[in-house]
Swiss-Prot record:
GO molecular function per UniProt: ribosome binding; rRNA binding; translation initiation factor activity
Gene encoding the protein: infA
PROSITE patterns with a match to the protein in the record: S1_IF1_TYPE
SUPFAM superfamilies per the UniProt record, alphabetical: Nucleic acid-binding proteins
NCBIfam families: infA
Organism: Kineococcus radiotolerans (strain ATCC BAA-149 / DSM 14245 / SRS30216)
Domain of life: Bacteria
Protein task: One of the essential components for the initiation of protein synthesis. Stabilizes the binding of IF-2 and IF-3 on the 30S subunit to which N-formylmethionyl-tRNA(fMet) subsequently binds. Helps modulate mRNA selection, yielding the 30S pre-initiation complex (PIC). Upon addition of the 50S ribosomal subunit IF-1, IF-2 and IF-3 are released leaving the mature 70S translation initiation complex.
Domain S1-like: 1-73
Keyword rRNA-binding in annotation: yes
InterPro entries assigned to the protein according to its UniProt record, in alphabetical order: NA-bd_OB-fold, RNA-binding_domain_S1_IF1, S1_domain, TIF_IF1
Protein name, UniProt field: Translation initiation factor IF-1
């Protein structure tokens, strides 16, 4: 699957789970962002818990919000 143009992918750790499938994620560079689960992860019932290592996609237009696209095993 080709990568999307213009998105920034960065690793992080889930700090806390919030209502409505939102999560607070601390990125590897120390910043904290608000992230939601991607549609494919919802479809396949992939569960995210605090302390999980994840990959977050950030839009260059709003670096304070992101989408969780992968959870490390």
């Amino acid at each position: 699957m080709p990568k999307k143009d213009g998105v920034i992918e960065i690793e992080g750790t889930v700090i806390e789970a919030l209502p409505n499938a939102m999560f607070r994620v601390e990125l590897s560079n120390g910043h904290k962002v608000l992230a939601h689960i991607s549609g494919k992860m919802r479809q396949h019932y992939i569960r995210i818990l605090p302390e999980d290592r994840v990959v977050v996609e950030l839009s260059p237009y709003d670096l304070s919000r992101g989408r969780i696209v992968y959870r490390y095993k």
